[in-house]
């Protein structure tokens, strides 16, 4: 394993590790009580395992997901990837990284959230993002060699001090409704990891990883695939360490029921409260600055990864516009939305993400399956069409736009996994139908 693989791996870790990933584990630790380990193991399986799988699958075809999805349907490939890149990019996730950074750095330190201060902060924030992203060939070095070490050092400082301060405490009482047994805790942790939706980002980030590996001079498909796997494993191991550590500390922080009820009543995030408390108790006045640095770096690296991904994709399908022009355009859109109407954008984006997430996971699993089993396009088209319909109907019903009792009665609906048994059945049907359809088997291009 060479130096470049480590740099790419740590870059991938930093791109995945946004502010939400910082908040989820302590909250899980606090809620899981005496059943922490089943919960955190399950959380890592879906919260890290699915994104890792998504990155690896992106390296199966030399054209990445574009090539793999074109074999399902060229039109589906374009529509699906445009929706993914826009929703996790300038229309949702990127503006949110800026607003989250502002809320957890400037607001608690300067005690202000005025529109003028937000404007100045986001202007500086996106100028830094633009500088880091304008040259895609340098993005891996800039994140992997500079920002990631800073991010890891600050997180490790908080984790080490947190262990010293809290590891001697007994586990929290936890949420005894959702985490009342080892099996119940495992299923809840599994669902919570699934709901991070990082598997969608994996589809976007896989292009950066493959391009970065190619830029080092690696040309052979098998070597690109192996280095992608190794880089993904480096990122996954780092994420597991941090998730488990933050979760363990959150599990041993004693928070009384009155405080938890008060936070819930005010719609305040318990994970954010635990992090703030951990930082303040461990480092005093400096704690809020340390946490601010961690959040800012986590958000910045994620924003950079998303800007580069969306710009590279659009430059690939609409090459008449340069990569730099796309970078400037998407950064500008993100800057505007971070200052104007972000809540409205989020309210529109979340249902869209909820629709495409099951489709994205189904796509990843079908591509992986086709790598080992002879597969015709119809065998992939049928389950994707079925899951697309189920996902749309499920989101419509869940949001109360039109209540559908048959959707609400589906197995695993309470875990937002109602699509999975249907995907399994639809895939079996797809492979059976394929036996009677005259199509060539899918072959992924390696060279």
From Swiss-Prot:
Family per record: Belongs to the branched chain amino acid transporter family.
Keywords, in A-Z order: Amino-acid transport, Cell membrane, Membrane, Transmembrane, Transmembrane helix, Transport
Entry GO MF terms: L-isoleucine transmembrane transporter activity; L-leucine transmembrane transporter activity; L-valine transmembrane transporter activity
UniProt cross-references to InterPro entries, sorted A to Z: Brnchd-chn_aa_trnsp_Livcs (IPR004685)
Function: Component of the transport system for branched-chain amino acids (leucine, isoleucine and valine), which is coupled to a proton motive force.
GO cellular component: plasma membrane
Gene3D superfamilies: Amino acid/polyamine transporter I (1.20.1740.10)
Protein name (database record): Putative branched-chain amino acid carrier protein SH1502
Positions of transmembrane segments: 6-26, 40-60, 74-94, 116-136, 143-163, 193-213, 229-249, 270-287, 290-310, 328-348, 350-370, 382-402, 417-437
Major place of residence: membrane
Pfam families for this protein: Branch_AA_trans
A single BP term in Gene Ontology: L-leucine transport
Recorded superkingdom: Bacteria
Bilayer disposition of the protein: Multi-pass membrane protein
Keyword Membrane: yes
Cell compartments where the protein resides: Cell membrane
């Amino acid at each position: 394993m060479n130096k470049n693989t480590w740099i790419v791996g740590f870059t991938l870790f930093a791109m995945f590790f946004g502010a939400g990933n910082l908040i989820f584990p302590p909250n899980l630790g606090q809620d899981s009580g005496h059943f922490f380990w089943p919960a955190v193991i399950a959380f890592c399986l879906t919260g890290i395992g699915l994104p890792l799988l998504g990155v690896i699958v992106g390296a199966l075809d030399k054209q990445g997901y574009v090539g793999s999805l074109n074999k399902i349907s060229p039109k589906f490939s374009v529509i699906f990837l445009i929706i993914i890149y826009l929703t996790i990019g300038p229309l949702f996730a990127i503006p949110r990284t800026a607003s989250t950074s502002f809320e957890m750095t400037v607001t608690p330190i300067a005690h202000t959230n005025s529109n003028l201060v937000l404007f100045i902060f986001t202007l500086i924030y996106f100028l830094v993002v633009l500088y880091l992203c304008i040259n895609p060939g340098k993005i891996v070095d800039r994140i992997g060699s500079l920002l990631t070490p800073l991010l890891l050092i600050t997180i490790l400082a908080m984790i080490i001090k947190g262990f010293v301060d809290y590891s001697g405490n007994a586990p929290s009482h936890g949420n005894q409704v959702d985490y009342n047994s080892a099996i119940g805790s495992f299923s809840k942790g599994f669902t919570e990891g699934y709901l991070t939706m990082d598997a969608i980002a994996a589809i976007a980030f896989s292009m950066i990883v493959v391009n970065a590996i190619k830029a080092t001079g690696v040309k052979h498909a098998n070597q690109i695939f192996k280095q992608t796997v190794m880089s993904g494993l480096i990122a996954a191991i780092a994420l597991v360490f941090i998730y488990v550590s933050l979760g363990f500390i959150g599990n041993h922080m004693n928070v009384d029921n009155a405080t938890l009820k008060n936070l819930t009543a005010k719609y305040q995030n318990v994970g954010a409260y635990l992090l703030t408390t951990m930082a303040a108790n461990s480092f005093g006045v400096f704690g809020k600055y340390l946490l601010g640095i961690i959040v800012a770096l986590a958000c910045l690296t994620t924003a950079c990864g998303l800007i580069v991904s969306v710009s590279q994709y659009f430059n690939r399908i609409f090459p008449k516009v340069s990569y730099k022009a796309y970078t400037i355009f998407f950064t500008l859109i993100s800057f505007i939305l971070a200052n104007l109407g972000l809540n409205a954008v989020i309210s529109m984006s979340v249902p869209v993400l909820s629709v495409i997430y099951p489709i994205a996971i189904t796509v990843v699993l079908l591509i992986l399956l086709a790598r080992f089993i002879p597969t015709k396009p119809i065998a992939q088209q049928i389950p994707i069409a079925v899951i697309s319909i189920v996902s749309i109907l499920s989101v419509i019903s869940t949001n109360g736009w039109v209540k559908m009792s048959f959707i609400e009665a589906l197995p695993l609906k309470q875990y937002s996994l109602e699509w999975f048994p249907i995907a399994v059945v639809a895939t079996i049907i797809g492979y059976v139908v394929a036996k009677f359809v005259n199509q060539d088997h899918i072959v992924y291009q390696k060279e």
